[in-house]
Amino acid sequence: MAKNKSSKSTSNTIALNKKARHEYFLHDKFEAGVELQGWEVKSIRAGKVNITETYIHLKNGEAFLLGAQIQPLNSASTHVICDPLRYRKLLLSRRELDRLVGATERDGYSLIATAMYWKNCWVKLEFHLAKGKKLHDKREDGKDKDWSREKERLMKHKA
């Protein structure tokens, strides 16, 4: 007998920051848990999350998520005052925090959020050590992408 498949999507991705690859040179990838309130979890399950302008701020040996917009649900947040842009603490090990502090203070890196997803029943945030691109870097990347598309087109017609 075949099992019935659920009608829910199997993707664990909640939100993506597609602009990050265009705006920054992404280096090392990290994963962190996010400390959330109950109404935020319900809103995330409903898909009311935006992380396009999101970055991580390190303060007093802790990491905080800034700029993530989690819009409250009307039904889930009737008795609580909800701030969609509040600081959300990231759950990282001490070794990871020390490495991030060193990279951001000494080497001039930024910490940019690239994805938010479910891992089992926990919300995880994927972020990268990143350096900002200048305008000429973006133009070079555009030329490289155009050239690779043109090469593929030529190889397709040649075959």
From Swiss-Prot:
Q: What is its main location?
A: cytoplasm
CDD domains per the UniProt record, alphabetical: SmpB
- Under which name does UniProt file this protein? SsrA-binding protein
GO annotations under biological process? trans-translation
Gene encoding it? smpB
**Which SUPFAM superfamilies would you find in this protein's record?**
Small protein B (SmpB)
Which residues lie in Basic and acidic residues bias regions?
A: 138-153
Kindly state one GO CC term assigned in the UniProt record. cytosol
Q: Where is this region: Disordered?
A: 138-159
Q: Which PROSITE patterns match?
A: SSRP (PS01317)
Question: What does the UniProt record say this protein does?
Answer: Required for rescue of stalled ribosomes mediated by trans-translation. Binds to transfer-messenger RNA (tmRNA), required for stable association of tmRNA with ribosomes. tmRNA and SmpB together mimic tRNA shape, replacing the anticodon stem-loop with SmpB. tmRNA is encoded by the ssrA gene; the 2 termini fold to resemble tRNA(Ala) and it encodes a 'tag peptide', a short internal open reading frame. During trans-translation Ala-aminoacylated tmRNA acts like a tRNA, entering the A-site of stalled ribosomes, displacing the stalled mRNA.
A Pfam short name: SmpB
Respond yes or no to whether keyword Protein biosynthesis is given for this record: no
Where found in the cell? Cytoplasm
Is Isomerase included in the keywords of this UniProt record? Answer: no
Record's keyword terms, sorted: Cytoplasm, RNA-binding
Q: Which InterPro entries match?
A: SmpB (IPR023620), SsrA-bd_prot (IPR000037), SsrA-bd_prot_CS (IPR020081)
Please report which protein family the annotation says this sequence is part of: Belongs to the SmpB family.
* Molecular function terms, GO-annotated: RNA binding
